[in-house]
């Protein structure tokens, strides 16, 4: 009986920290993970990522296909080295990349992400290609800077990428 209760408790903890559709972290799980990983001398990148024209995908292909896109895209994001990935809502994701210091290294990770996304096969999409816009902001320092400043900057960078007709990455 104790094993059943423990398994149920572990399930409840998992569900409280993860997005049910995509399997990536939710906001609560991300906040907890960042606090677990972060140290005062930490550095890396905070990224905000949106799927381009996701509403059009839902409109043209239906919400079930949209759900498949979200799930596949979330799993593609999980391939970023040293990352914690969360779905913030809708088609917006947050990626905390720990320990990558050089812009060249984050660009390599983003290129690999583009390759993974291009390889997603969902027959219901037909000729529609999945593309994304991303803002990536380098951070160094304490958790308060990450929460207060870096997220805001990454979000603005993502918005700038979207204004460039999508399928774009802006790094700062």
Language-model features: locations:
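N-terminal membrane insertion elements
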Residues: 1-6
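Amphipathic HAMP/coiled-coil signal-transducing linker helices
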Residues: 8-25
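Conserved long alpha-helical elements within nucleotide-processing catalytic cores of c-di-GMP signaling
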Residues: 17, 26-45, 52-79, 86-90, ...
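PAS/PAC or PAS-like capping segment
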Residues: 51-52, 100
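GGDEF/GGEEF active-site signature
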Residues: 72-140
């Amino acid at each position: 009986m104790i094993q059943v209760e423990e398994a149920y408790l572990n399930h409840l903890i998992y569900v409280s920290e993860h997005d049910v559709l995509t399997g990536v972290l939710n906001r609560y799980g991300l906040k907890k993970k960042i606090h677990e990983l972060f140290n005062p001398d930490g550095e890396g990148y905070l990224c905000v990522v949106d799927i381009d024209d996701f509403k059009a995908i839902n409109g043209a292909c239906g919400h079930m296909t949209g759900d498949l896109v979200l799930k596949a895209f979330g799993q593609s994001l999980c391939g970023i080295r040293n990352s914690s990935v969360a779905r913030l809502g809708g088609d917006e994701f947050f990626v905390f990349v720990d320990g990558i210091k050089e812009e060249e290294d984050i660009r390599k990770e983003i290129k690999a992400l583009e390759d993974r996304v291009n390889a997603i096969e969902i027959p219901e999409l037909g000729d529609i290609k999945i593309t994304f816009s991303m803002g990536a902001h380098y951070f160094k320092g304490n958790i308060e800077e990450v929460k207060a400043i870096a997220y805001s900057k990454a979000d603005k960078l993502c918005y700038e990428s979207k204004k460039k007709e999508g399928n774009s990455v802006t790094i700062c």
